[in-house]
């Protein structure tokens, strides 16, 4: 199995590869959508990118990329010696420097270990990828532990909701405990109209509460549904919406380019105080 994974890659330099886990703790915040759009945007900037769908048995990243009919082999077959890693890495036809690796097929479950993930990522690094983005399973159980094991950096995705913020705070602590200190925040599904009515926390409020450097903010967009059904990330639309522009902006910031953050309005300090009280357990009369 080790020989299958490392075939033809032993002498290549992998020191320049950045391995980033995209995580959230809470499901339904747009983590997989974020992975697809950041990955595609980074590839369009000229970098070689590998995306790993680490959600065992519940993969969706292939659907968002329009690659579901091309997934013949997965990491499971690689580990079992049925194929080599290069056969399981599916190259995107639109941007050949973007590849997808699924851990398992939809109805399969594989007992993945931390060692499996580390070996897998090490082998991808040997193929001279500039970026490896790992789409982490929702939750903080063994799937989370395995997905973050090979990562050196993390992007925490949250929404401006108290439950999502609290989960993001817990995930940030777990990442630090795992030795991942390069963590950035992406606030998704922002509603400027609700912020103006003081019904939603602003992006700045969320960032200040979590104390994590802000990578970007993505507005709520009904085009996400259309994008998912078409298997085409928002950033590939001919006419970019604000959410598509925001994803591209975040991708440029992630690769180190100096880009201004997309401003999605300001918030209300009274609402911020109420949520802070809730998160700290002192929500009397809230």
UniProtKB/Swiss-Prot annotation:
The UniProt record lists the keyword Kinase: no
Residues engaged in binding ATP: 26-33
Gene3D superfamilies the UniProt entry points to: P-loop containing nucleotide triphosphate hydrolases
Compartments it resides in: Plastid, Chloroplast
Record keywords: ATP-binding, Cell cycle, Cell division, Chloroplast, Nucleotide-binding, Plastid, Septation
TM region(s), chain numbering: none
GO BP terms in the entry: cell division; negative regulation of cell division
UniProt-listed InterPro entries: CobQ/CobB/MinD/ParA_Nub-bd_dom, MinD, MinD_FleN, P-loop_NTPase, ParA/MinD_ATPase
SUPFAM superfamilies, A to Z: P-loop containing nucleoside triphosphate hydrolases
Chief localisation class: plastid
GO cellular component terms given for this protein: chloroplast; cytoplasmic side of plasma membrane; cytosol
Molecular-function GO term, any one: ATP hydrolysis activity
Family: Belongs to the ParA family. MinD subfamily.
Its biological purpose: ATPase required for the correct placement of the division site.
Name of the protein: Putative septum site-determining protein MinD
